[in-house]
Amino acid sequence: MAEFFLVKIKRKRKKVPFQNDLVKELTNVILKSAKGDKVVFGSRAIMESMAYMMERMITRGSVSAPDYPYNAAEMVVDYIYPEFGKDKLNIIALCDACMQFSEPGKIFVQTLEVFKSQKFIPDNANQVIDHFYSTPCIQIGKTVSMVQGLISMGMMVGDRLKLYLQGNDFMPFSNVIHKLLGFGMNERIKNRYFMLDIVRKDYVLDNPLLQRYIAVVGAPIIKDCNEDYWSILPKGFSSADYWIDYFPAIEQVYNCLSKGQTICDMIPWCEKSPKVNVDDRCYMEPWSRVTDTYLCPYAMLWKNWNLEGYIPTI
């Protein structure tokens, strides 16, 4: 969305799509523009906002981007408490802290409102992170510290993710989980300000901290301005033992089963792959690739989730 002039922020309760005993509803934060457009301010908007702010601060020649989602966090800060956002590091710190919660949009807005009521302007963006680490959190009905919550949630997420593809044949998938979660928990425990420190180390090509992180954990799938796709693997790993592309494939299968989506959005990525031959099935029935000799990530998930032979009712 190229231009989005924020005029209203609204909270809306939403029932979770899958019943469980712990969470019945979630809070969606809705942003409304002067033109009447409505968008959700949640994890994607916060993540993209933080990344775009950091890109502008540590790279050269950064291009302008649509207001939503890339400027969403800055727009919310300008709307609620503009004084807080005069130092962009404050916004980055708030984004980073809120992304550690299950309802980041709700926490982002609530925290800004608390800061405004207290007239709190940090002398250093680290104080924003400290605010969260000094405040107890509620996790699955229990009061925990931020560090305790981080460790227990990281372990739980790792256990759940490994259930998607089980067995020794899928160690490349488990490698990604161990590497990313292990790094994330370890780095946050050792240095809770590491996101801020990346920016403070300045220009990306001369940034020793970012270079170390990329060497250790690589980078997610990247799409550049030429619509080309790239991945940076951790040092010592090859694509054969580090299956990063299975994570977007999980989303594609979910979109098919829960939303009736027939097209696989990984087509641009697979078109660059030396092994996957994109054809009409990818647009109309990607699950039918389960009979191929070489299974793409979508088909591999479909087969190993015992869905072979199942045809979705769209």
Task: Give the label of every model feature segment.
Residues 1-8, 64-314:
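Non-catalytic terminal regions of proteins
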Residues 1-61:
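Metalloprotease/metallohydrolase-associated module, dominated by Zn2+-dependent proteases
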